[in-house]
Amino acid sequence: MGPICVKKHLAAYLPKHVSVVNGEWSVGHNTHNSPLTTHGAVSAAPYGSASILLISYGYIRMLGDEGVKAATEYAILNANYMRARLEGKYDILYTNKNGQCAHEFIVDLRPFKKSAEVEAEDVAKRLIDYGFHAPTMSFPVPGTIMIEPTESEDKAELDRFCDALLSIREEIKLIEEGKSDKKDNALKNAPHTQSVVTADEWKHSYSRQEAAFPLYYVTQNKFWPSVARVNNTHGDRNLICTCEPVESYMAAEA
């Protein structure tokens, strides 16, 4: 998608391309003959996808100078509005001397691991119950979420997201105060699917309403997740094909 820069001693391990040898165009030359080449191409174009640049180009051309400036101003304004609403309840990282951020900001969730055994993943999964896809998690700082509202969201949507995070902070506070169980709580079990909430049996220490409808706005337009909590790390480290055996496809064709 974009340029990747490495130091000289790593150059030999970068992907190569049939049309480029050691940074020079050589049409028709097979770079696998090059002593530095140890890996083949990873994209059709030598330096990534040129078509991706058309999106940025079109965005800039359509907005024009004033439009790009205005969009940037609104993006920074939106980010700082959200930062100001969340400040005091969450620690905000990397602000300037005036306590402000740029177009995005980082919410530090690491203190909650010690105080309530709540991690960034728990907050990310819980946001789904509030109708939001989680923002960037654990980048560039582990145990954090990075929020970038951009210029396109209106104030009502920004408030809705802030309300969700503030509500989650209150849920964490209940755990910190011992009023909610550290193992069996709405964050650790999030997200809650429709089948789980409507099941005949409910063994949790919190109510079904707390699980699925934590704020009023959620009752008006509920997004139901299709799956509950999965072990992301286990899945990444234990890749298992869930396809039918090859023989079954052969039998079907016959």
What would you call each of these model-derived segments?
Residues 13, 22, 111-113:
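Short alpha-helical interface patches
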Residues 10, 14, 43, 133:
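Glycine-rich, flexible loop/turn motifs
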Residues 3, 49-51, 65:
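Gly/Ser/Thr-rich helix-start
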Residues 44-55:
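PLP-dependent aminotransferase class I/II
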Residues 20-27:
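Acidic, Ala/Val/Gly-enriched low-complexity intrinsically disordered segments
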Residues 1-19:
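Active-site PLP attachment segment
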Residues 27-38, 42, 60-254:
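Non-catalytic terminal extensions of PLP-dependent enzymes
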